[in-house]
From Swiss-Prot:
Involved in the remodeling of the N-acetyl-glucosamine residues of proteoglycan complexes during reproductive development. Is essential to promote the first divisions of the zygote. This is Alpha-N-acetylglucosaminidase. GO terms for molecular function: alpha-N-acetylglucosaminidase activity. The gene is NAGLU. GO terms for cellular component: plant-type vacuole. Transmembrane segments: none annotated. It catalyses: Hydrolysis of terminal non-reducing N-acetyl-D-glucosamine residues in N-acetyl-alpha-D-glucosaminides. SUPFAM superfamilies: (Trans)glycosidases (SSF51445). Disruption phenotype: Embryonic lethality when homozygous, due to embryo development arrested at one-cell stage.
Length: 806
């Protein structure tokens, strides 16, 4: 295992700036020492770990002795140690867990519960916690060897994406946040993003620059769209923010930070990226402020389009950036040195001149360092992938080398699919964190690349001249695919690749509380299918039920059915394949993402259901069973849609009628299926939004935000739907029945009418109707959707399997 000292030596050798260490060019060692100095006392961290144990296993609160140890006891880095407790008497602690921070203690506890007690921890919405397998106090499994010693091969385990706060956390109160921070500690996360409540800080800062509340009403986005307002993609959409919201979120942030710190985590706070209210132009007419281009509005509506960016080279940028950092310190205390800033994310500099780019980067960092002399810039590396035509090696080097060595850390955001580290000479000497992106928009889709997750961090760390300093998870939305996140978290403690096949057997046994051969066989299939995506395609869920294609079937005619430019689809329940042919043209038939054999996954579902009588009491089993049934049926619906469009092109009105009814029936059946699990309900999302409201106006606004984000997302007009519609689609009961079903019905009715009347399909008419339907649904507040499941999930899944795959 490579030690941190070796990594640091390599960092020094390849440093662009200097081959010697000085107080002006600190190494990662120096940064870690300074961050350690900000941590609370050992007793505080031990108390936090004991509190977690009490919440997780209240019956075993006296069964474990938890202690903080120094890094020297771990060879100079972070670690946890699990030993048998050999105290006097037979009553009291049985297991001793030691760690360098509260996070390491929690990680050690989790490791022991997983690998000695077959326990399992996942998000509540993915089945929750399974600790029934833990033996009673006095009978805990002993450690066979002298001890279990696990040392971090890299110092950091990073967590969150800048948009997770909107897709997943937006409606959370402290009770839910407490469970999340516990989950984070158990997974070993020690470098989490902490973006909640920053609008209250900005209000105080901008007040010093004569920006009024009314100006900020046009600047802040609504609760469900704050992430994109913060990035300068939009303004005012879904707003304004009430005083209640600002005050409550700031209070919540202080609770979040307090708990993170007690565990020994280092929170990453926001910094100034240059995004400013439009009113600043009038107050500072000489300032170098640029209006940005349209970001995804349908017609450039100035009410929310085209935000303003203060150029980093302007002295006002430094002044505002310094004020923001200092205001956070005043509110929260000296709790971190690491700040996130993504000035250039989806915001290409006006020139590719390396000197200019270097000057911009230096200015961004100067604003941070004026506010905190020890500031370190944490930057998402998404721009190097999404805008690779601009960010060539000269531009990349110019930005990465614009700050002192050791003062920037890059997130290799999409490393499990499109790593940058191996194409950029390890970010030209800049420390980076290997990250898994995995999820977009909080979509619900069984998907992953487990082999890449097992091997990627290890390959990066042991590669020549490695500058890797962490493993991270940067999903846009959480509470899906728990297997992916458990493995990724574990890789922060693994110095070698994991045998995924063996690991999954252990995972299944832990997750369902017992060994079951059908389940093991099912997971073997899932490992090689849904969790083995290697096509390099970003998995935005494009299943046609939740993202009905805005496609004009009249654009394809019978003559287009040629073998040229064709593709394969798997048709219906017949578990065979036939060729459906469409010529590649501008209005080509939409294709949902499919990277595996549907036949094999149907077999995995059969195995899952065979195990149902043995595992039906397990909430984790029920969640996975419902999710797998949904996955199978959604892919079948994609095939049915394709066959329906083919029937339309062939003017086969009889087949079109039958296939369209089958598609609609699938939506209804899937709604019933999803209604049988508490974790798949629209009502939970809507009610959590309304629960935060303090009055009727807020209640209406928050519900509109919640409804809009998961459907139309952004602005539209009478004839043009939002460019981001269905980006955050969800397979939730209630949403299928009341939104996706009527939309699909409108679409197929227009197709049938077109054939009956022998007229061209009027795509504009259908668009107008479904946009009107969507607006009405978004603005509605009369329906109250269930927050509790109904129906027997196992019986429903078995019925649907026999119905569609007899």
């Amino acid at each position: 295992m490579h030690s941190i000292k070796l990594v640091l030596l390599v960092l020094l050798i390849i440093s662009f700036h200097s081959q010697t260490v000085s107080k002006h060019h600190p190494t990662i060692d120096g940064l870690l020492d300074r961050l350690d100095s900000l941590l609370p006392t050992s007793s505080v961290q031990e108390s936090a770990a004991k509190g977690l144990l009490q919440r997780l296993l209240p019956t075993h609160s006296q069964s474990f002795e938890l202690r903080i140890i120094s890094k020297d006891a771990c060879g100079g880095t972070s670690c946890f140690v699990i030993e048998n407790y050999d105290g006097p008497g037979r009553i009291g602690p049985e297991i001793l867990i030691k760690g360098t921070t509260g996070v390491e203690i929690a990680s050690g506890l989790h490791w022991y519960l997983k690998y000695k007690c077959n326990a399992h921890v996942s998000w509540d919405k993915t089945g929750g916690i399974q600790v029934a397998s833990v033996p009673q106090p006095g009978h805990l499994p002993r450690i066979d060897s002298k001890r279990i010693f696990i040392r971090r091969p890299v110092p950091w385990n990073y967590y969150q994406n800048v948009v997770t706060s909107s897709y997943s956390y937006v409606w959370w109160g402290w009770e839910r946040w407490e469970r999340e921070i516990d989950w984070m500690a158990l997974q070993g996360i020690n470098l989490p993003l902490a973006f909640t409540g920053q609008e209250a800080i900005w209000q105080k800062v901008f007040k010093r620059f004569n920006i009024s509340k009314e100006d900020l009403d046009d600047y802040f986005g609504g609760p469900a769209f704050l992430a994109w307002a913060r990035m300068g993609n939009l303004h005012a959409w879904g707003g304004p923010l009430s005083k209640n919201w600002l005050d409550d979120q700031l209070l919540l942030q202080k609770q979040i930070l307090s708990r993170m710190l007690k565990f020994g985590m280092t929170p990453v706070l926001p910094s100034f990226s240059g995004n400013v209210p439009s009113a600043l132009r009038k107050i500072y007419p000489e300032a170098n402020i640029t209006r940005l281009d349209n970001w995804n509005t349908v017609d450039g509506d100035s009410r929310w389009c085209c935000t303003y960016l203060l150029n980093p080279s302007d002295p006002l940028f430094i002044e505002i950036g310094e004020a923001f950092i200092k205001q956070q310190t005043e509110e929260y205390g000296e709790i971190t040195n690491i700040y996130n800033c993504d000035t250039f994310n989806e915001n290409t500099p006006p020139t590719s001149e390396p000197e200019y780019i270097s000057s911009l980067g230096a200015a961004v960092y100067k604003a941070m360092s004026k506010g905190n002399k020890n500031a370190v810039w944490l930057m998402q590396g998404w721009l190097f992938s999404s805008d690779s035509k601009f960010w060539k090696p000269p531009q990349l080097k110019a930005l990465l080398h614009s700050v002192p060595f050791g003062k920037m850390i890059v997130l290799d955001l999409y490393a499990e699919v499109k790593p940058i580290w191996n194409k950029s000479a390890q970010f030209y000497g800049t420390p980076y964190i290997w990250c898994m992106l995995h999820n977009f928009g909080g979509n619900i889709e069984m998907y992953g690349a487990l082999d890449s997750i097992s091997s990627g961090p290890v390959d990066a760390r042991v590669s020549k001249n490695s500058t890797m300093v962490g493993v991270g998870m940067c999903m846009e939305g959480i509470e899906q695919n728990p297997v992916v996140y458990e493995l990724t978290s574990e890789m922060a403690f693994r110095d070698e690749k994991v045998d995924v096949q063996k690991w999954l057997k252990s995972y299944a046994r832990r997750r369902y509380m017992k060994e079951n051969h059908q389940i093991e066989a099912a997971w073997e299939i899932l490992y090689h299918t849904v969790y083995n995506c290697t096509d390099g395609i970003a998995d935005h869920n494009t299943d046609f039920i939740v993202k009905l294609p805005d496609w004009d079937p009249s654009s394809s005619v019978q003559d287009d059915l040629k073998q040229k430019d064709s593709y394969m689809i798997s048709t219906g329940p017949y578990e065979t394949k036939r060729r459906v042919l469409f010529q590649d043209k501008t209005a080509d038939l939409p294709k949902a993402h499919l990277w595996y054999s549907t036949k094999e996954v149907i077999q995995a579902l059969k195995l899952f259901l065979e195990a149902g009588d043995d595992l039906s009491r397990s909430l984790t089993y029920r969640y996975d069973m419902v999710d797998l049934t949904r996955q199978v049926l959604s892919k079948l619906a994609n095939q049915v849609y394709t066959e329906a469009v083919t029937a339309f092109v062939k003017k086969d009105i009889g087949s079109l009628g039958q296939l369209s009814e089958k598609f609609l029936e699938l939506i209804k059946d899937m709604d019933v299926l999803l209604a049988s699990d508490d974790n798949c309900l629209l009502g939970t999302w809507l009610e959590s939004a309304k629960k935060l409201a303090k009055n009727g106006d807020e209640r209406k606004q928050y519900e509109w935000n919640a409804r809009t984000q998961v459907t139309m997302w952004y602005d539209s007009n009478d004839v043009n739907q939002s460019k981001l519609h269905d980006y955050a689609n969800k397979f939730w009961s209630g949403l299928l029945e009341d939104y996706y079903l009527p939309r699909a019905r409108l679409y197929f009715n227009e197709m049938l009418k077109s054939l009956r009347d022998k007229k061209i399909f009027k795509v504009e008419k259908w668009r107008r109707e479904w946009i009107m339907m969507s607006h009405k649904w978004q603005q509605s507040s009369s329906e109250v959707y269930p927050v509790k499941a109904k129906g027997d999930a196992l019986a429903i899944s078995r019925h649907l399997l026999s119905k569609y795959f007899p």
